[in-house]
Amino acid sequence: MIYIRFIFFALLLSEYTAVSAVSVGENSPDCLLDSISPHKDIVKLEHPTNKVLYVDFWASWCSPCAKSFPFMNHLNRQFEERGLQIIAINLDENPDDIIPFLRRFPASFSIVRDKNQQCAKAFSVQAVPSTYLIDKQGRVRYIHLGFRPSETTQMLKIIQQLLDE
């Protein structure tokens, strides 16, 4: 089953070659996303928001994604009142895979779904998890692929710097 998901994600990524990658310093793309809530609201990711955005692309089958959720919960507790907004964008093909994942790894931050992969294409996502830190003016300031607990100190420093600007 993991092999099939890998093949699906590889095929998904193959569509990104024609799209130029979002780079540090560029404006963040605007996206329409589906809320993971009983109301099924449409969420618009747009800028500027006067908040620092931590945008994380993830999938339920991704082991590093699961490891990143406690860190994002920690960030949300520590920095939400200072203006950090965490938006975790799910890329699963089957939306039914999301709820069991969230039961195992609860989230205190916004979870949305990119059902047509349009936001992932706009950001030129190459791997999951992929994290984009976006400043209050809507510029991408930091991009990180993967998740390793040993690298969280650097990310904390960057978030604090962006919140202080």
Q: Can you say where each PLM-predicted feature lies in the sequence?
A:
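Sec-dependent signal peptide recognition
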Residues: 1-9
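Short pre-active-site segment immediately N-terminal to redox-active cysteine/selenocysteine motifs
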Residues: 51-53, 57-61, 127
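Hydrophobic beta-strand core positions in alpha/beta domains
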Residues: 54-56, 88, 132-133
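Thiol/disulfide oxidoreductase modules built on the thioredoxin-like
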Residues: 100-107, 115-158
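Conserved redox-active cysteine motifs that mediate thiol-disulfide chemistry
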Residues: 57-74
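N-proximal helix/coil linker or "cap" segments that precede and/or mark the start of modular domains
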Residues: 8-32
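A short beta-strand-turn-helix
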Residues: 31-53
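Conserved segment of the thioredoxin-like fold in thiol-based oxidoreductases
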Residues: 29, 77-117, 122, 128
